[in-house]
Design a protein with these regions (language model features):
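N-terminal core-binding DNA-recognition domain of tyrosine recombinases/integrases
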Residues: 1-62, 84-94
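C-terminal catalytic core of Y-nucleophile DNA break-rejoin enzymes
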Residues: 150-174, 190-212
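Catalytic-site neighborhood detector that most strongly recognizes the C-terminal catalytic loop/helix
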Residues: 252, 256-279
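Conserved tyrosine-mediated DNA breakage-rejoining catalytic core shared by Y-recombinases
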Residues: 42, 46, 121-172
Length: 292
């Protein structure tokens, strides 16, 4: 079909289409069986069976570099990032402050579901209060002013609310702003950028990538993953936290829900939880008895 091989998910989509057509044309409620026998002397039949169907080899079959991380992988990534900073500091080597900044940046990307450019283009003025979450101070919401543009248009803007499951980011950012950012550079106070270098300039996208790769490799996580996988993780985990689809779509700045759906790769545990909930709703106490 070309130089670029088809993805497993694409092939499965083709398979499902053909399988559904075969189910339709072989359905005894319709006259297609007898009509085909009369016209072609042969009856149609289902061509896909368990032994020749594409099997699920993984929970997520999209771009491997951007698959969502599990909760354990996210924790391992953050622990590794913190560990890198601790090791540099214990050896009294240069770069400890930068490593602490990098760990905070990765946590920010995940906690707000940000793209790479959106992250490095954040300014101090983009941190906002949320009247419904006063205890988070100025970390209740985040203004994204450099979102992905559509067809050459201007950058899209959105406000990302801090969800309760991510409230820990307020402590991370407080420590970064009060202790880490001032220690990076004497000129950081004159910069409007949230994420700065030791020269007081805005951190680059490349530096953000390198921060992720260093933590990823230290954590022993799949080396094919890139920084954008944290955004996919955010979407997937909000789904597993039972947030409405429309809310998630607004949080990540997608124009279409179909785009948000591509990001999702929920765990088997979540699927089982949904199934159990549905069975309880449908069968009530009868399901409890059957389960025992």
């Amino acid at each position: 079909s070309g130089a670029k091989p088809l993805r497993v998910s694409t092939l499965r989509g083709y398979e499902i289409d053909i399988k559904m057509f075969c189910e339709y044309i072989t359905d005894p409620r319709y006259p297609w069986l007898s009509e085909c026998e009369a016209r072609f002397s042969v009856a149609p039949r289902q061509v896909f069976h368990e032994d020749n169907s594409i099997v699920h080899v993984s929970e997520y079959e999209g771009d491997a570099a951007r698959r969502p991380l599990t909760f354990d992988e996210v924790q391992a990534l953050f622990d590794a990032a913190d560990g890198l900073a601790a090791r540099i500091r214990s050896r009294r080597r240069k770069g400890a402050v930068q490593a602490i900044r990098d760990a905070a940046l990765l946590k920010c990307v995940y906690a707000f579901g940000l793209r790479r450019r959106e992250t490095v283009m954040l300014d101090l003025v983009d941190l906002h209060r949320n009247a419904k979450l006063p205890h988070l101070d100025r970390f209740g919401a985040l203004s994204v002013r450099h979102g992905k543009a559509s067809r050459g248009g201007p950058s899209k803007r959105r406000t990302v609310l801090t969800v309760p499951e991510m409230e820990w980011i307020s402590e991370t950012l407080t420590h970064y702003l009060e202790e880490v950012r001032p220690a990076l550079s004497s000129s950081s106070g004159s910069s409007s950028a949230l994420w700065v270098t030791e020269r007081g300039t805005r951190l680059s996208r490349r530096a953000a990538n390198e921060a992720f790769c260093a933590a990823r490799d230290a954590a022993g996580i799949d080396s094919s993953l890139d920084l954008h996988s944290l955004r996919h993780s955010y979407v997937t985990h909000l789904v597993e936290f039972d947030y409405p689809e429309r809310f998630i779509q607004e949080q990540v700045g997608h124009s279409f829900s179909s785009t948000t759906a591509i990001y999702v790769g929920v765990s088997n545990e979540y699927r089982n939880r949904l199934l159990t909930r549905a069975l309880h709703t449908r069968y009530g106490s009868d399901f409890e008895g059957a389960a025992r």
